[in-house]
Amino acid sequence: MASRIGIANDVTELIGNTPLVYLNSVAEGCVGRVAAKLEMMEPCSSVKDRIGFSMISDAEKKGLIKPGESVLIEPTSGNTGVGLAFTAAAKGYKLIITMPASMSIERRIILLAFGVELVLTDPAKGMKGAIAKAEEILAKTPNGYMLQQFENPANPKIHYETTGPEIWKGTEGKIDGFISGIGTGGTITGAGKYLKEQNPNVKLYGVEPVESAILSGGKPGPHKIQGIGAGFIPNVLETNLIDEVVQVSSDESIDMARLLAREEGLLVGISSGAAAAAAIKLAKRPENAGKLFVAVFPSFGERYLSTVLFDATRKEAESMTFEA
């Protein structure tokens, strides 16, 4: 990762140093301030660009993989696959991705464009199904190596080394609460640990779907917030760091994501809507008056054009005709 001064040596040096911006219109009625960490401004438009690079680089440094020889394998709901795909392309690796068939068509197209071998799995089996298929492929692939985002320490490590320090610097150390949707748990674990080391009073808030509230003691279930709520507690997630888990429904998340586009000019994915909805709930609590909350917006909305997020907009666009 570089400071973006001059010309980068390759695309991986463009990762990180994403901006922070206050939410204004959608945060009316809040007694605290809410800022968003715009991870959709990464080279391939999601926070997973960070871990795609970090997991491959870490394995290289340990001598576990070599370009042109090793075959990388990973189960993903989409964005980690894209983060791995552009790094693998830049470094010269073959990559096999397993992904639930319920993920957006945009993700399939992007992965294929990067030269990925894509294997779709039963959507009813969720991420567990994708993981099982990846393990099956690994067992029969010579020189195969699974990066294991849900277990790989290089996942939270990159957030400890980059995301956390960026937020601390960007807020001039004035952050009071950090909000992150929980998929692998890498972002909240890594960035959260760094922020708490700087100031133990910083509160960490995890966001999960109401429909699959595992962290809150509920059962896994189907939901529409792609990228979070995997249906199990990942090994890299340090739950002891989290001060509170905020539940947000799929409908709340979708409505907020649409509102962010119309009222803030921020075209974001559904999980960003979930993070914003959770942050606004927190910033409306009387005890949080004057406090600053930072929410991670993980991905760009253009990756979700075929999903429920843009159903009405897509139908309107498709029904339009030219004027004489």
From Swiss-Prot:
Keyword Cytoplasm: yes
Pathway listed: Amino-acid biosynthesis; L-cysteine biosynthesis; L-cysteine from L-serine: step 2/2
PROSITE patterns (alphabetical): CYS_SYNTHASE
GO MF annotation, one: cysteine synthase activity
A GO biological process held by the record: cysteine biosynthetic process from serine
Positions carrying N6-(pyridoxal phosphate)lysine: 48
Coiled-coil region: none
Gene3D superfamilies (alphabetical): 3.40.50.1100
Binding site for pyridoxal 5'-phosphate: 79, 183-187, 271
This protein's UniProt keywords: Amino-acid biosynthesis, Cysteine biosynthesis, Cytoplasm, Pyridoxal phosphate, Transferase
GO CC aspect terms: cytoplasm
Electron transport among keywords: no
Required co-factors: pyridoxal 5'-phosphate
Protein family: Belongs to the cysteine synthase/cystathionine beta-synthase family.
Assembly with partners or alone: Homodimer.
PANTHER family: CYSTATHIONINE BETA-SYNTHASE (PTHR10314)
Name recorded for this polypeptide: Cysteine synthase
Lineage, uppermost ranks: Eukaryota, Viridiplantae, Streptophyta, Embryophyta, Tracheophyta
